[in-house]
Amino acid sequence: MIKKFIALFCVVVMIVTCFASCKKEDTTNKFFAYGITQMPKHFDPQIAESEVEKMIAVNTFDGLFKLDENKTPQKCAVKDYKISNDGLTYTFELRDDMNYYISGDVEDFLEEKSTTINKNVVAKDFAFGIIRALLPETDAPDYELLSAIKNAEKIHKGELNSSEAGVKVINDYTLEITLERKDSNFLYALTQPVSFPCNQQFFELTAGRYGLDEEYIISNGGFYLSSISEDKNVVINKNTEYKGNFAAIPSGVGFYLNATTLDIAEKVDDGTYDVGFFYEDAEKQELGRSVVKTELKNIACSLVFNMADKTTQNNALRIGLVSCVDISKDFENPLKSVLPSYYNVDNSKIETLAYNIDFARSNMLKAFDELKIKTLDIEIICTSEYENTAKTLVNNWQKNIGVELNGIVTVLEESDFNKRIVSDDFQVAIYSLTVDSNNPSEYLSMFTTDNEKNIMNYKSDEFDRLVKDLRNSPGNEKVVYCQSYLLKNAVVLPLFEETTTYAVNKDASGIYFAGDSSNMYFYKAQK
């Protein structure tokens, strides 16, 4: 009897063990690793500029809206909203259960200041954050996203006080925003860091250090800024007190510094990292079967002219230089539109300056006459990866134009190249224009007069009007017309397309990016 009992007991143990071993492994509460090539300079969402700065912001903050996998804005801090019949007034009813996460570092900072703050996220926090982004002293890189707000442009120029902004707090949980013009892209703007909430009391307590370290930032999203190891990594951890619709499944995400994107590619391949974006040589990296790749044609390698330079601001000169280049013959993956193909715009009716040597020569002669010169030295600056491209362009100019033109190619380290671009110390540059918005009108707005990203210093009232009209009422025909305007005026010469490769380890799921790498979301990540 005892032997039978022991035998039965062993069978039961084996069955239980079998079921236990067959139990599905828990894929939640895991830690994820992402490779970066540049450490964030700060964590202030209103002035977030780099890919990683924006990525950390969209994961640690809840804006009024959040982008889903289809790039569509979904209600986030907003419980309900309505838009007036004329499309100019937005009224948002906010959730009443949102709170800022107060980390141990922030607690220590507040204790040092002998004060406390209201953890509730209310309408005035969103109003303060948005108005901050309009102020000239904030110098928000993405101010343009909010420029349709009533009086935004005058406030940004310092012509009006911020109290005149079309942003009104009705009560703690009702916010009203009035626009000066209709903006089809406005809900998208409210998914971006530039519009995120900012607690005024905490902001003022930091005395100019807001967002510079983990103790100087509070956020209301599914993650919070946990630690910063200078020149090594940044870690965001799950906000266990979060009550919104986008609760974090993973325990946290680490952003780890690498020398090149090739290093990131190798680490995603060997499983050190879960996900990464690759550029340049990393795209050619042979990745193993454990990695799923997606390629985005989101970079337009272009020849750009500096309109602040007295020579290249001459319209005839630019037309001459552009008209003697046959991009279809000289470059692989030639691009005949200002927009990269990422946007899926029908550009079949786009108008460009055709390759025409006689036309190029006549315009150059006209330019020489207008500039009152007989010879011309013109410099193209570029980084080493585009040296051959620059030499091809110079050879075309010197061979085809037939006037006294001397093209000079100056190859620079990336840091020196960027310094010259920012300081307007260039005539012509080979520059990668990269998608940083899901909307063609935002991409095209980088050519508008007051846009922070207008490295060409191009100023055209007519083009500004065209982009505003496009934002008011979007349409393929208008997108094409805007591009044609830039191309026919030789503001930019698109040369060829480049791709960004998004790779994720096949064991990871739930990570998604809504259009561009800065809008990558980790809250649903599992492995």
What are these regions (language model features)?
Residues 366-434, 500:
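Ligand/substrate-recognition segments at binding pockets and active sites
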Residues 404-417, 442-506, 527:
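Extracytoplasmic/peripheral linker and loop segments enriched in polar/acidic and small residues
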Residues 502-527:
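Long beta-strand-rich cores associated with HINT superfamily self-processing modules
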